[in-house]
């Protein structure tokens, strides 16, 4: 491991006696320490309560659930949130030497939640010579009296400091910003659940440099693109020494949702979100026999006494560890301690070559549970997942794959649809070889397309375009949907013409049924939002001898009344939501029905790629005509659902949250259910229009498993 830090002083070495790892325990605590990192565990709380790097306190004083961690937390008991270890934990200390001769020590927190029998385990391991903690998290359920308990809605570990040491947070190059100051937080104005503005502190560095609004979703990221995230201390509160605290996703095979899954990363807390449905992917059910060990991941702490390394230097140091091959021998050595971890003796590899369609960019190969759409792999709670970028020659390779059957999915920017092959068998100690040709789907001669098939709606207005009003220029979609004004952007609604309109400005990144209110505007708009008009010309040659036409619509995310829960509610009129497409003056629409179990949350949770929904719809070619044609995309007029949420409102001072949830109406195409509350959200993103000479291919859709 590359260290960027100077040696610690001799006086400190004398205090610790040597560079060898040490452990100690009393009736109330366990301590793990090497020559640089020290972790103290509370036996009564089942978690870390003190953490030091080069004698620098990384956590600060404990106050409730702050000043602690990494620790395990979940939304998984019948009533919702629970912190494993808070009832009656037992802690066990491990010590040993791995295959390389390096000493290690570990702590296991073990607890059974009495009302349900859910069994929780959290593991932390410290190796000599490293400045971080390897973590595994386990949940097991073997209660026959209640075979189905609930869904595992959130399962996460948190590094949750309570100190002014940390000055910046970072999840990507465009998601790096100063942390809001204590004064800004004290005077913040709530504009939506988990969303604030700092307009009462206009000189705050976050407000000046990054955005007017702060939400935990601003720093969320897709797992394909995210391997390291965390916080940085610039030395201003630590005598000039810089520090970093990073979650390193060195393995991703025990998460769910594939590379499109996106989640919270850092917001003053450094998260490891093992399971959640924040952006609409499914979550596993906790049923009799559920037994899942997540990990390993690695909380890495760097910089230290005398360090002047920059944020990017410390983050780059952490990124060198974000590799599944890193520390494999160590993980094999501790497998005897970690229930449910799959050692390398039970893993193989996959190598493949895919002949890609013309125009494919950023291709990726994904291995997930056999027989299921890759975003739905949580339907098999024991499933594993892997992916690899495909190079320019079509080659990819994946190592350390758990033995078993897999589905191979290949997708790429610029190509509609996916390549899918089931039955890929991986055997322990063996290499599986794949060679395939991906033929791009087609229903005939493509007449026009609007948008880029990249599983995102970011190319449209207020998507990935960079904010011009702040020096750090974050992508606009990351900031907060209420920062923008539909009525200023589209006073007459959407009226788009193929060939002349600009998708970056003339089409919105989200199709609202109803928009508003926002913090700056109490108005609610629904007359210009629900219908979008797409104009397109056709010539005689386009229509000559054509009998059938096909409209393909691909949505980067869609919101129905079910939000993120996948729960059908018969009392809600829009539990299933219809996006209707009207061709010219035809009275009957083509209907894309978004099921209650396909609903997700994107734009109010600062994302433009969520659970994918698509359909190919045939219609008679005589619905079309020579000259201008009109496609109307129709959402229900002023469609809302009843939600429990903090809703946007015009605010002039600080809003204090009441003890009970606020009830209100929010847009059906702009609302979402989170782990405990609902919030607002988007719907339409990408279109392609095709005409064929004879019979078109069958209708195609991606049903989502419950």
Curated annotation (Swiss-Prot):
GO molecular function: carbohydrate binding; rhamnogalacturonan endolyase activity
Pfam families tied to this protein: CBM-like, fn3_3
GO biological process, one term: cell wall organization
Catalytic reaction equation(s): Endotype eliminative cleavage of L-alpha-rhamnopyranosyl-(1->4)-alpha-D-galactopyranosyluronic acid bonds of rhamnogalacturonan I domains in ramified hairy regions of pectin leaving L-rhamnopyranose at the reducing end and 4-deoxy-4,5-unsaturated D-galactopyranosyluronic acid at the non-reducing end
Keyword check for Signal: yes
Listed CDD domains: RGL4_M, RGL4_N
Entry's localization field: Secreted
E.C. code: 4.2.2.23
InterPro entries tied to this protein: Carb-bd-like_fold, Gal_mutarotase_sf_dom, Galactose-bd-like_sf, GH-type_carb-bd, Polysacch_Lyase_4, RG-lyase_II, RG-lyase_III
Main EC class the enzyme belongs to: lyase
Glycosylation, residue list: 27, 40, 143, 239, 285, 380, 495, 569, 597, 638
Source domain of life: Eukaryota
Signal sequence, start to end: 1-19
Keyword line: Carbohydrate metabolism, Cell wall biogenesis/degradation, Glycoprotein, Lyase, Polysaccharide degradation, Secreted, Signal
The UniProt record lists the keyword Lipoprotein: no
GO CC list: extracellular region
Functional note: Pectinolytic enzymes consist of four classes of enzymes: pectin lyase, polygalacturonase, pectin methylesterase and rhamnogalacturonase. Degrades the rhamnogalacturonan I (RG-I) backbone of pectin.
Family stated for the protein in its record: Belongs to the polysaccharide lyase 4 family.
This protein's name: Probable rhamnogalacturonate lyase B
Organism encoding this protein: Aspergillus niger (strain ATCC MYA-4892 / CBS 513.88 / FGSC A1513)
